[in-house]
């Protein structure tokens, strides 16, 4: 009887193994069934940045104006500007002493360190829009080990969140100018020392930023003189819904609402599936399965793959979502998802606003 049982178990093992193709790798499946998600970027002034974790169906909301600078927590010493509030930075020529820099000496440079003025020359004052950090270009140069090699920069603090009424279906994300600062960043052990002051001041403040490797970045609010929590831990978010400074080829920097970044610094890859007419993009999304995934298509060095490509604010029927495309996402834990957008505006009227209001996109997603 024992021999018969062993034989049956061995046979069952062969049958179960024969169901796995030698050319197929096992697919990690996220611990969630997927969902339809309404995101609150906060309405037509889009005050929020929303950090979303697909595998946990969780989100964290922060205000765009809560921070100005992000300090890379890996081995490189790089500093990133808050593009959601239209920040920019320009090196002050021949300046190594921040306290010696006067406002009068910066009059000419202030006319150049601007965002969204349709000047291709202003691209050097913003960071690599693809977000390919730490390797990508940053307006504030890499922080050197020798203090004297670190320049002083003119910092355009960007724009406040707009405070006023906005017509239904429109967006207005830029408020009053937030002013200017001068800044110099040097190393402090394995972290950063930030020297900063208003342009009219002859003495500066200092903050030490210690790297926390559980996160992509440490974030700093210069206006509040302190570190702040913004992004969740590096493996705890996949997508960010935000206002974003991008580049239009030949026209310089430009600011987009309804933008979606993926967490490429944290290891999230994305590619777009665009379905040619007359085939249905919705049907293609519904039919897409794990065996359709093409690993070679995932892009890990550009966080603008979704970007603003999912919506058309000047469509035939007004504000539209493109129904001919969807996105395949691989998170840092190796989980795969398919995702498509279904609405650009608010679906119903409630305490947060009227139906048709911008800043409330809807998407659906499923694990693969």
Predicted regions and their residues:
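Sec-dependent signal peptide recognition
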Residues: 2-8
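C-terminal motif of bacterial Sec signal peptides marking the signal peptidase cleavage site
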Residues: 15-18
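Short, intrinsically disordered low-complexity segments
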Residues: 1-2, 22
């Amino acid at each position: 009887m024992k021999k018969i049982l062993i034989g049956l178990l061995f046979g069952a093992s062969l049958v179960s193994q024969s169901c796995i193709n030698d050319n197929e790798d096992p697919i990690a499946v996220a611990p969630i069934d997927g969902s339809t998600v309404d995101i609150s970027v906060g309405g037509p002034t889009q005050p929020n940045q929303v950090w979303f974790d697909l595998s946990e169906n969780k989100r964290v909301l922060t205000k765009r104006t809560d921070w100005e600078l992000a300090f890379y927590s890996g081995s490189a010493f790089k500093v990133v500007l808050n593009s959601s509030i239209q920040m920019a930075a320009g090196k002050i020529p021949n300046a190594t002493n921040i306290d010696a820099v006067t406002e009068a000496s910066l009059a000419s440079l202030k006319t150049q360190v601007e965002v969204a003025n349709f000047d291709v020359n202003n691209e050097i004052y913003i960071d690599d829009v693809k977000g390919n950090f730490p390797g990508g270009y940053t307006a504030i140069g890499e922080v050197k080990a020798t203090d004297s090699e670190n320049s002083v920069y003119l910092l355009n603090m960007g724009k406040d969140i707009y405070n006023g009424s906005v017509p239904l279906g429109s967006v207005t994300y830029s408020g009053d100018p937030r002013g200017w600062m001068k800044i110099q960043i040097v190393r402090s052990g394995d972290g950063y020392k930030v020297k900063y002051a208003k342009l009219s001041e002859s003495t500066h403040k200092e903050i030490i930023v210690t790297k926390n490797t559980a996160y992509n970045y440490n974030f700093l609010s210069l206006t509040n003189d302190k570190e702040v929590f913004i992004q969740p831990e590096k493996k705890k978010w996949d997508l960010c819904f935000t206002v974003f400074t991008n580049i239009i080829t030949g026209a310089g920097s430009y600011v987009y609402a309804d933008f979606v970044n993926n967490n490429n610094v944290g290891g999230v890859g994305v590619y777009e599936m665009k379905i040619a007419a007359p085939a249905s993009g919705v049907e293609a999304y519904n039919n897409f399965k794990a065996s359709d995934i093409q690993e070679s298509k995932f892009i890990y060095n550009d966080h603008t793959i979704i970007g603003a490509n999912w919506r058309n604010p000047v469509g035939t029927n007004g504000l539209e979502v493109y129904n001919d495309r969807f996105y395949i996402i691989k998170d840092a834990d190796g989980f795969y998802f398919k995702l498509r957008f279904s609405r650009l505006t608010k679906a119903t009227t409630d305490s947060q606003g009227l139906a048709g209001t911008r800043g409330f996109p809807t998407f659906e997603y499923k694990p693969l």
